Amino acid sequence: METIKALTDTAALQIETYPSLTSKEKVKRLIKSCIPGKRPAPLDAFSWPNALLGKGLLCAWEAVGDESALRAVAGYLKRWKTKGFPIRYVDNLMNGTLAMELEGLLRGGADSWTASISVSGTSSATASVSVSGIFGADEVSEYLTLCREAVDACAAWLKAAPRTENGLLPYRKQHPDWLFADALAMVSPFACRYGKEYGDKALSELGIRQLTAFMEKGMDIKSGLPYHGYDEKNGMKYGIIGWGRACGWMLLGLAESLPYVENEGTFTALEKAYGELLTQVFQWQREDGGFSWQLSAQEGHADSSAEGMIGLAYALAKKNFRKAAFDSESICTFEAEMCVNENMTRLCEAAKRRIINGKVGSCSGECLGFAEYPQVYGSYPWGNGSILGFLSLWSKEWEE
């Protein structure tokens, strides 16, 4: 649990301070702003890196009942409200999913967690940790209102956002026909959960279509792995096959959306696709237990963010599919075929080796677009958040 605590402290700090620029980065932005037609993109403190940190922190709360993890997420959403819930891209919708997760905790519903906590330095004991025991009644009321406002803001933006000809959400308005794997974990979990919990059939269908369209048009038939994305208008597939984070985005999108799919036929088809993709991904597990930045690049650099997202997606599926209305068969098939306990343990150990002083290293830098994958590795929020979430949930899974 010391590892999870150290990662939690890092994530709690990063979710409050990211992005922060070095002096060198500030100079670069200043120079770029002086070039006609070149304006640096505005910094976004509420984008997907921060939301991934929040997801990891909520997983840490589940594993060890760490009050600082829960307060960090609540404080993050409060800062987002203070800024007026800015939503520039589909990335920001992940905050809506985070708000629904926190709302479930505050209401004491199905998402309330029982944490394994250390008692007086002895072996861990299971105890019910009440959110109301951390937040006072006034705070609970304040945060419930905050969560509802955040969710409403995301739903309103999603309903008004420009769509492709087939009614899907492009990743960026500059390319209105481009569909990215990244968006599957940004749009679908929010749309599917909102649709079920708020009775909005149109958003439920949008979340499902976003997933099924990519399964039909964004995959490499031979390997069963995704391209980074595709052009809806001409059908061209872009990026590399089997980019590690693209696989992670897809698996996360499916794992977090499926529990809220209400049609049995649709659930079965998507759950089967999840199991098949997971099986193909683990065919490329490295000898050291991890995953490369591009899965097939076995002698290339390991990428802790790919490892964290893939591991987190599996751990979330194990947790979330218990809430689904229908039986899950593909998880059982995957576990039988892939010696899952052994391979997930190997992945867990590989992830732990990336951690130095509470920070996850060997994380690939931010992707700049289709086929733009800088070979720069270090410690980034998407590595810290996803590894924290994976290790937290997997440690709890083992204890259970």
Language-model features, listed with the residues they occupy:
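Oxyanion-binding "anion nests"
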Residues: 249-295
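Inter-helical turn/loop segments and adjacent helix faces that build the functional surface
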Residues: 64, 109, 194-205, 257-268, ...
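Extended ligand-binding groove/face enriched in aromatic
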Residues: 71, 82-112, 135-231, 237-240
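CBM-like carbohydrate-recognition segments
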Residues: 2-51, 59, 63, 79, ...
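Alpha-helical scaffold segments in carbohydrate-active enzymes
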Residues: 59, 79, 153-160, 186, ...
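Short, contiguous, pocket-lining structural segments
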Residues: 45, 179-186, 199, 206, ...
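Ser/Thr/Pro-rich low-complexity tandem-repeat tracts
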Residues: 111-112, 116-120, 124, 128-141, ...
